[in-house]
Amino acid sequence: MPNAIFRSVMTPLDESELAPPGAIGEGGISNGLYSIHLKILDGLPGGLSGVMLLNNGRILGGDAFFYYLGSYSSSNGRWKGQMVNQEHTPARGEDPVFGGHEIGIGFSGTCDAEGGTLEGTALAGKRSIRFEAELKLICAA
Protein backbone atom coordinates (compact mmCIF):
# COMPACT_ATOMS: atom_id res chain seq x y z
CA MET A 1 0.00 0.00 0.00
CA PRO A 2 1.91 3.05 -1.17
CA ASN A 3 1.87 6.02 1.21
CA ALA A 4 -0.09 4.03 3.82
CA ILE A 5 0.55 4.93 7.43
CA PHE A 6 0.66 2.08 9.91
CA ARG A 7 0.71 2.65 13.66
CA SER A 8 1.55 0.05 16.25
CA VAL A 9 -0.86 -0.12 19.14
CA MET A 10 2.06 -1.01 21.42
CA THR A 11 5.83 -0.69 21.37
CA PRO A 12 7.08 -2.92 18.54
CA LEU A 13 8.62 -6.20 19.65
CA ASP A 14 12.40 -6.42 19.49
CA GLU A 15 13.80 -9.77 18.36
CA SER A 16 16.84 -9.30 20.62
CA GLU A 17 14.54 -9.60 23.67
CA LEU A 18 13.29 -13.06 22.64
CA ALA A 19 14.60 -16.44 23.70
CA PRO A 20 17.29 -17.70 21.31
CA PRO A 21 16.23 -20.09 18.54
CA GLY A 22 15.97 -23.68 19.71
CA ALA A 23 17.66 -26.81 18.39
CA ILE A 24 16.09 -28.70 15.50
CA GLY A 25 16.85 -32.40 15.32
CA GLU A 26 15.93 -35.32 13.10
CA GLY A 27 12.17 -35.69 12.76
CA GLY A 28 11.62 -32.04 13.72
CA ILE A 29 9.09 -29.71 12.13
CA SER A 30 10.17 -28.45 8.69
CA ASN A 31 11.21 -24.89 7.89
CA GLY A 32 8.48 -23.17 5.89
CA LEU A 33 5.33 -21.09 5.75
CA TYR A 34 2.31 -22.61 7.52
CA SER A 35 -1.35 -21.78 7.86
CA ILE A 36 -2.42 -21.79 11.51
CA HIS A 37 -5.95 -22.25 12.83
CA LEU A 38 -6.38 -21.67 16.56
CA LYS A 39 -9.32 -22.56 18.81
CA ILE A 40 -9.81 -21.37 22.39
CA LEU A 41 -10.46 -24.16 24.94
CA ASP A 42 -12.28 -24.36 28.29
CA GLY A 43 -15.64 -23.42 26.77
CA LEU A 44 -14.58 -19.88 25.89
CA PRO A 45 -15.59 -18.47 22.50
CA GLY A 46 -12.92 -17.45 20.02
CA GLY A 47 -10.34 -18.50 17.54
CA LEU A 48 -8.22 -17.11 14.77
CA SER A 49 -6.52 -18.02 11.51
CA GLY A 50 -3.24 -16.68 10.24
CA VAL A 51 0.19 -17.64 8.97
CA MET A 52 3.35 -18.76 10.73
CA LEU A 53 6.88 -18.87 9.32
CA LEU A 54 9.17 -21.41 10.98
CA ASN A 55 12.87 -21.04 10.22
CA ASN A 56 15.67 -22.78 12.12
CA GLY A 57 14.14 -22.35 15.55
CA ARG A 58 12.64 -18.88 15.00
CA ILE A 59 8.87 -18.12 14.70
CA LEU A 60 7.37 -15.17 12.80
CA GLY A 61 3.68 -14.83 12.03
CA GLY A 62 0.40 -13.04 12.38
CA ASP A 63 -3.09 -12.29 11.16
CA ALA A 64 -5.17 -9.20 10.34
CA PHE A 65 -4.72 -7.66 13.81
CA PHE A 66 -1.82 -9.36 15.58
CA TYR A 67 1.76 -10.43 14.94
CA TYR A 68 4.01 -12.69 16.95
CA LEU A 69 7.67 -13.54 17.31
CA GLY A 70 9.19 -16.46 19.12
CA SER A 71 11.42 -19.50 19.19
CA TYR A 72 10.97 -23.26 19.17
CA SER A 73 12.86 -26.53 19.34
CA SER A 74 11.82 -29.74 17.62
CA SER A 75 12.85 -33.38 17.07
CA ASN A 76 11.37 -36.87 16.89
CA GLY A 77 7.87 -35.70 15.92
CA ARG A 78 7.55 -33.23 18.83
CA TRP A 79 8.01 -29.49 19.15
CA LYS A 80 7.72 -26.82 21.83
CA GLY A 81 8.32 -23.12 22.10
CA GLN A 82 7.33 -19.69 23.23
CA MET A 83 6.08 -16.53 21.53
CA VAL A 84 5.15 -12.95 22.28
CA ASN A 85 1.95 -11.79 20.55
CA GLN A 86 1.12 -8.12 20.00
CA GLU A 87 -1.58 -6.08 18.27
CA HIS A 88 -0.41 -4.22 15.12
CA THR A 89 -3.81 -2.85 14.00
CA PRO A 90 -6.57 -1.84 16.41
CA ALA A 91 -9.25 -4.53 16.51
CA ARG A 92 -12.07 -2.09 17.24
CA GLY A 93 -15.49 -3.51 16.47
CA GLU A 94 -13.97 -6.99 16.48
CA ASP A 95 -13.83 -9.51 19.29
CA PRO A 96 -10.11 -10.31 19.30
CA VAL A 97 -9.03 -13.47 21.05
CA PHE A 98 -6.30 -11.70 22.99
CA GLY A 99 -8.04 -8.33 23.42
CA GLY A 100 -5.30 -5.74 22.92
CA HIS A 101 -2.82 -7.14 25.45
CA GLU A 102 0.79 -8.07 24.85
CA ILE A 103 0.62 -11.82 25.32
CA GLY A 104 3.22 -14.37 26.38
CA ILE A 105 2.54 -17.83 24.98
CA GLY A 106 4.04 -21.24 25.73
CA PHE A 107 3.18 -24.35 23.70
CA SER A 108 4.04 -27.96 22.91
CA GLY A 109 2.74 -30.46 20.40
CA THR A 110 3.39 -32.97 17.64
CA CYS A 111 4.69 -32.52 14.10
CA ASP A 112 5.39 -34.33 10.84
CA ALA A 113 6.42 -33.43 7.27
CA GLU A 114 3.02 -31.83 6.50
CA GLY A 115 2.46 -29.72 9.62
CA GLY A 116 1.79 -29.94 13.31
CA THR A 117 -0.56 -29.51 16.21
CA LEU A 118 -0.03 -27.71 19.47
CA GLU A 119 -1.65 -26.93 22.79
CA GLY A 120 -0.65 -23.82 24.62
CA THR A 121 -1.38 -21.24 27.25
CA ALA A 122 -1.53 -17.51 26.61
CA LEU A 123 -1.08 -15.11 29.50
CA ALA A 124 -3.31 -12.09 28.76
CA GLY A 125 -3.20 -9.54 31.54
CA LYS A 126 -4.32 -11.50 34.63
CA ARG A 127 -6.00 -14.21 32.53
CA SER A 128 -4.60 -17.49 31.37
CA ILE A 129 -6.18 -18.73 28.12
CA ARG A 130 -5.72 -22.32 26.94
CA PHE A 131 -5.88 -23.04 23.22
CA GLU A 132 -5.12 -25.63 20.58
CA ALA A 133 -3.97 -25.05 17.02
CA GLU A 134 -3.34 -26.91 13.79
CA LEU A 135 -0.60 -25.97 11.33
CA LYS A 136 -0.48 -27.02 7.68
CA LEU A 137 2.61 -26.55 5.54
CA ILE A 138 1.89 -24.16 2.65
CA CYS A 139 5.41 -23.77 1.26
CA ALA A 140 8.64 -25.42 2.41
CA ALA A 141 11.63 -23.12 2.90
Predicted regions and their residues:
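Residue-level signal for secondary-structure boundary sites
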Residues: 42-44, 89-91, 128, 141
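Contiguous, well-ordered beta-strand patches that form the walls/edges
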Residues: 2-3, 64-115
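Well-ordered beta-strand positions in beta-sheet-rich domains
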Residues: 49-51, 69, 104-108, 130-134
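Tryptophan-anchored aromatic micro-motifs
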Residues: 2-44, 118
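N-terminal glycine/threonine-rich, aromatic-flanked beta-hairpin/loop signature
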Residues: 44-86, 120-121, 125-127
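Short, solvent-exposed coil/turn segments at beta-strand boundaries
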Residues: 29-33, 51-60, 74-78, 109-116, ...
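Short, compact, well-ordered microdomains
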Residues: 112-136
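Short, solvent-exposed secondary-structure boundary motifs
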Residues: 35-44, 57-65, 96-102
